[in-house]
């Protein structure tokens, strides 16, 4: 590492970038010529790993001058105010929505404002109507909520907290409704997916996606025909004076949804150790491996890797990463700012604490 440090100092003194792709290709070509054919691939992988470890070490010092490094360092070193107990919070849906349950778990005294759509929640935050917004990002049964990932790329908001909420779905209907009379069931697509085993056993029942589980309950509660039902939370039973036709109909007993708390401005509250980022990398062999090597070199724990298609670019993808690394680790800010230079596009969503 002394040699790496010497190279790093030379680059800093001469204002040279940490990454030097042409020089790396020269070295790899030279190594390939020195090795037997059956060892060429292994040799290139070995030297790429050496390059990645070396660049991660160099970046600890070189990246201190980058705007992103300074911005993250300022957030870390800012006055460590605790996460607020009271706030005006935007949630999607109506009273009884799972987003409301998440908000009440994150804030002791939330003043909740509802919006019909996820995008509407984000706009309430960016327009300054609410200080924070609550959005579901993934479920342990149905997977990621892809719409949220797409919205995070489009809007300039920041994740400042997250939590997990146990989700127990109930089949609800207006008072006096009989199970055998049900012809239509409404709910959010994620809830429908999470209850697919129960729903697949029903005959002659139409399943209709709805914007929100609580909004579905509100609609069904007003149905004069008594032929519809909703998949909703237990909170909706009393809120909308509903009948429980079937309890806990989710596919698995352990069914949890992760919710993120977003804010207009980036904040890093004390105890934060989970970071979310997005990258678009060049469509070349080894680029994803190179990024993963940087996580390994800095001791960052990769807890989530998600890919999403890039609109207008056939079979090319953007990648979402969640990593765990203490904000007080001196490698943290340099890792994030180094990743900023590793792809075609990079976005830092935030560093936060997850409440279990």
Q: Which residues are covered by each model-predicted region?
A:
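Domain-level signature for soluble enzymes in the chorismate/prephenate branch of the shikimate pathway
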Residues: 1-356
């Amino acid at each position: 590492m002394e040699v790496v440090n010497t190279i790093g100092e030379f680059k800093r003194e001469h204002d040279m970038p940490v990454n030097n792709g042409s020089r790396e290709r020269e070295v790899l070509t030279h190594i390939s010529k020195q090795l037997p054919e059956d060892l060429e691939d292994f040799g290139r992988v070995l030297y790429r790993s050496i390059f990645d470890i070396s660049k991660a070490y160099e970046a600890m010092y070189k990246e201190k001058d980058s705007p992103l490094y300074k911005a993250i360092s300022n957030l870390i070193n800012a006055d460590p105010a605790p996460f607020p107990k009271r706030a005006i919070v935007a949630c999607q849906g109506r009273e009884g929505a799972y987003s409301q349950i998440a908000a009440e778990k994150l804030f002791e005294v939330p003043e909740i404002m509802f919006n019909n759509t996820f995008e509407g929640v984000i706009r309430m935050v960016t327009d300054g109507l609410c200080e924070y917004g609550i959005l579901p990002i993934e479920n342990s049964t149905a997977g990621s909520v892809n719409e949220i990932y797409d919205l995070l790329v489009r809007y300039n908001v920041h994740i400042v907290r997250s939590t997990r909420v146990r989700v127990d779905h109930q089949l609800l209907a207006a008072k006096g409704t009989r199970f055998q009379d049900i012809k239509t069931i409404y709910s959010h697509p994620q809830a429908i997916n999470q209850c697919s085993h129960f729903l697949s056993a029903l005959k002659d029942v139409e399943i209709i996606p709805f914007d929100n589980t609580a909004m579905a309950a509100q609609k069904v509660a007003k149905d004069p025909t008594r032929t519809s039902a909703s998949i909703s939370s237990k909170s909706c039973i009393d809120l909308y004076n509903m009948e429980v036709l079937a309890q806990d109909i989710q596919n698995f007993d352990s069914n949890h949804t992760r919710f993120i708390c977003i804010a207009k401005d980036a904040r890093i509250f004390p105890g934060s150790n989970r970071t979310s980022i997005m990258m678009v990398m060049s469509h070349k062999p080894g680029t994803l491996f190179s990024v993963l090597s940087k996580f390994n070199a800095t001791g960052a724990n990769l807890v989530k890797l998600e890919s999403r298609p890039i609109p207008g670019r056939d079979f090319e993808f953007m990648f979402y990463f969640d990593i765990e690394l203490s904000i007080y680790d001196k490698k943290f800010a340099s890792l994030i700012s180094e990743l900023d230079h590793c792809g075609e596009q990079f976005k830092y969503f935030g560093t936060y604490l997850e409440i279990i």
